[in-house]
Structures are given as C-alpha cells and as structure tokens.
Amino acid sequence: MAENLACGETSESWIIDNDDDDINYGGGFTNEIDYNHQLFAKDDNFGGNGSIPMMGSSSSSLSEDRIKEMLVREIEFCPGTDYVKRLLSGDLDLSVRNQALDWILKVCAHYHFGHLCICLSMNYLDRFLTSYELPKDKDWAAQLLAVSCLSLASKMEETDVPHIVDLQVEDPKFVFEAKTIKRMELLVVTTLNWRLQALTPFSFIDYFVDKISGHVSENLIYRSSRFILNTTKAIEFLDFRPSEIAAAAAVSVSISGETECIDEEKALSSLIYVKQERVKRCLNLMRSLTGEENVRGTSLSQEQARVAVRAVPASPVGVLEATCLSYRSEERTVESCTNSSQSSPDNNNNNNNSNKRRRKQ
C-alpha cells in the first residue's frame, strides 16, 4: 500500500521548506537546465558544443584525441573511491541502492525507457550517496531519491517523458507530490555539481567494439549492452571506470564473434588507452556473475533465450531493460557479490494494490 506524502508533511526535513514560489511545476528547472541532451548549467563544458558522446554515435566521429579527453574526464562522473567499501562495511545502507535499482528497472521496463536512462539513473544515485547521507529515520527518503534520479535521467535521455508524478508506477511504497520531487531533484543536481550528462560505459562502447572487431553492428552493440546493464546490479563493478566496463563488454562479445572468433589476448592487446589488466579483471568478474558460457556467447539460459526472442518485434530498446531484468539473484554470483544481487520483482499483486493508495494526513 503506497503512502502519498504531501509536501507539508515533510516540512521539518532536509528537503522541504515552506516557500514554494521558486518551484517550476511544469517541465523542471527550465531556466537552468536544457534537457535536450546538452550539458547542464554551471561550468561543465566539454569540447566545442558542450555535449558528451553517448552510445549510438558513430565511432568514426570520435577522434583519438576526443577519446583521450573522455578517458581523462570519466573519473569526474564516478562515485567516490571508498563508496564500495562503505557499502560492503555497512557504513552506507546497501538496501537503499538495491531497492532503488529494482524499482528503476521496473519503471524503465514499464515505460520502455532506454538502456542509458537506467545507467544514468544509477550513476546519479551512486554519486549522490557518495556525497550526501540520507536521513536514516525517514523511510521514504530512499524512494524519493530513486524517483528524482530517474526523473532527471529520463529528462536527459528520453523524448517521451511522462509527468513527474506518473513516473511513480510499479507499486512504490511511497508516492510523492510533484513539488516534493522537484525539490529533491534540485538537491541532487546541486550535490552532483550540475554534472548530469555523465560519461558511462555506453559512451565508449561503440569505440571499443569497432577497435576490437573492426566494425560496429547492431548485434554487437545489443550483446554488449546486455553485459553493461547487468553490471549495474553488482556493486563490485563500481570499482571499475566506465571505459573499463565498456572495454570488457566489447571483448566479451568479440571473442565469440559474429563470423569468426577473435582470440581474447588479441582483443585485449588492441586496447591501447585502458589498462589491459583491469579490463581482464572486469571481464573475469562478468564471467563469474553470468557464467563462462554466456560471456563467451556460446549459450544462453532458458530465460535469456526467451527474452532474446522478444527482441525481434517493435521495441529493441525496451528489450534491453527486459534482458537486464532477466538476470535474477538466483543466478550464479561471486561470493563477495551476494549481498548486492537483486530479488526478482514480483508483479502479481500490482493491479490489486494500485487502488489501495491512501493519502497520509
């Protein structure tokens, strides 16, 4: 049963004040933020037009100098170096991240949001939790953060974005008013220093696939995307840079090959701008999580095969989220990742619960 939290009920909290005059209730902070795939305000300029290459652009459009610049800048969009250690030690509540990711995946599948929207949402959430501690006595704070991160990511990446309140589907425990979400959005963007068009593994995947395989195809990108999306679940991947995850994903699909297999050592040797040993460690972690056969592309589980069949019709982007969702926590994981695996979502009672929401007075 979801609780609808009105703005006034949280007036004593860190996120709300009583002056709502400065809130834009329409499309966000439109005077300060351009949601058309441009960098946010402040001083976060990147290159000539301020944009950062995202997945889908031709790898030939990225010069070697541009790639080098991206490799230097990517660390600015990573969580703190002690973030994973704090999650594993209990200093930060791992369940906050797990629950947020579970809900974000379900909402992205519901609205057919793209793979990059998932990646950006979690990038914002992880970077925020690095710098800002949520109040432990507010059960709703984690859900509000998840809604705000997804809202910001969808405005950055999607062309058809539902109203901010309508994002709260898939039976969330709490439901928030628009002005409450917008205040949290403002806290997120200021905490992240307005740097929201982040460099992610998807920013590099075309380049590395082309570098290793000599060409970029939809099939190679699709298969690489599966591995990248799956890395969002295991927090150990947060110790790797986005470029290293992208390189490992590119190697994993190239060594199975579309027409001929590329030797793993040969594939790794073609990676001149990243540390090959770290890429190999990342690749081995992918194998541990999903199984040697899946990383080598030689077989798929029954569930993965079922999802792959659904890739043929209308929405290939939506299938990527479904593929990510197909990796359940019961699949083989490395021992150290046990606590970061997700329970599979249970949607059986969604329709029954959707009409049970009440407003908390």
Swiss-Prot record:
<dbReference type="InterPro" id="IPR004367">
    <property type="entry name" value="Cyclin_C-dom"/>
</dbReference>
<dbReference type="InterPro" id="IPR039361">
    <property type="entry name" value="Cyclin"/>
</dbReference>
<comment type="similarity">
    <text>Belongs to the cyclin family. Cyclin D subfamily.</text>
</comment>
<dbReference type="InterPro" id="IPR036915">
    <property type="entry name" value="Cyclin-like_sf"/>
</dbReference>
<dbReference type="InterPro" id="IPR048258">
    <property type="entry name" value="Cyclins_cyclin-box"/>
</dbReference>
<dbReference type="Pfam" id="PF02984">
    <property type="entry name" value="Cyclin_C"/>
</dbReference>
<keyword id="KW-0132">Cell division</keyword>
<feature type="region of interest" description="Disordered">
    <location>
        <begin position="335"/>
        <end position="361"/>
    </location>
</feature>
<dbReference type="GO" id="GO:0051301">
    <property type="term" value="P:cell division"/>
</dbReference>
<comment type="subunit">
    <text>Interacts with KRP1/ICK1 and with the C-terminal domain of CDKA-1.</text>
</comment>
<dbReference type="InterPro" id="IPR013763">
    <property type="entry name" value="Cyclin-like_dom"/>
</dbReference>
<keyword id="KW-0131">Cell cycle</keyword>
<feature type="compositionally biased region" description="Low complexity">
    <location>
        <begin position="339"/>
        <end position="354"/>
    </location>
</feature>
<keyword id="KW-0195">Cyclin</keyword>
<protein>
    <recommendedName>
        <fullName>Cyclin-D2-1</fullName>
    </recommendedName>
</protein>
<dbReference type="InterPro" id="IPR006671">
    <property type="entry name" value="Cyclin_N"/>
</dbReference>
<comment type="function">
    <text>Acts on the G1 phase of the cell cycle to control cell division rate in both shoot and root meristems. The complex formed with CDKA-1 phosphorylates plant retinoblastoma protein.</text>
</comment>
<dbReference type="Pfam" id="PF00134">
    <property type="entry name" value="Cyclin_N"/>
</dbReference>
